[in-house]
Amino acid sequence: MADVVVPTVAVPEAMPRYAMPGDAGADLTCRHDVDLAPGERAMVETGVRVALPDGYVGFVNPRSGLAARHGLSIVNAPGTIDSGYRGQINVLLVNTDPREPVHLDAGSRIAQLVVVPVVEAIFEPVEDLDDTERGQGGYGSTGVSAMPPVDG
């Protein structure tokens, strides 16, 4: 794994951290207590600003544990942090649970920041595209089950 230096402005307790060696995402925390009613969304401050190097992007992803336990997700997941952005990273959280409110204490881990290299595509105009086996099929066109049916 290559190291990429990312200049970061944050109070020490808000500094993004990898929970385990080899993790792809560094945890982002909330600066203040957050209360979300069922179906409610809120822009949550992390107190973190980064200067991603040219050629890199940051993706702000939901944390699977919050989704599984509380139905908490990110409205625009993944959020995109471009290399030229210097503002605070905010996370647009949403409580998808139809019945239970969610409370997060200040300092709770709310999202993961994944930093990856960017490949800049060159979009070339053409009259048509090559045929493939999949063709124009989308939205479930490849089926649901990955397992072959079991004869009974």
Curated annotation (Swiss-Prot):
Catalysis: reaction(s): dUTP + H2O = dUMP + diphosphate + H(+)
Cofactor: Mg(2+)
Segments for region (Disordered): 129-152
Residue spans crossing the bilayer: none
Its EC number(s): 3.6.1.23
InterPro entries: dUTPase, dUTPase-like, dUTPase-like_sf, dUTPase_trimeric
SUPFAM superfamilies: dUTPase-like (SSF51283)
Pathway in which this enzyme or protein is active: Pyrimidine metabolism; dUMP biosynthesis; dUMP from dCTP (dUTP route): step 2/2
CDD domains xref list: trimeric_dUTPase
Pfam families xref list: dUTPase
The keyword DNA damage is annotated on this UniProt entry: no
Record GO biological process: dUMP biosynthetic process; dUTP catabolic process
GO molecular function: dUTP diphosphatase activity; magnesium ion binding
Binding-site residues, substrate: 63-65, 76, 80-82
Keywords, alphabetical: Hydrolase, Magnesium, Metal-binding, Nucleotide metabolism
Family per record: Belongs to the dUTPase family.
NCBIfam families: dut (TIGR00576), PRK00601.1 (NF001862)
Annotated HAMAP family: dUTPase_bact (MF_00116)
Function: This enzyme is involved in nucleotide metabolism: it produces dUMP, the immediate precursor of thymidine nucleotides and it decreases the intracellular concentration of dUTP so that uracil cannot be incorporated into DNA.
Protein name: Deoxyuridine 5'-triphosphate nucleotidohydrolase
Organism expressing this protein natively: Cutibacterium acnes (strain DSM 16379 / KPA171202) (Propionibacterium acnes)
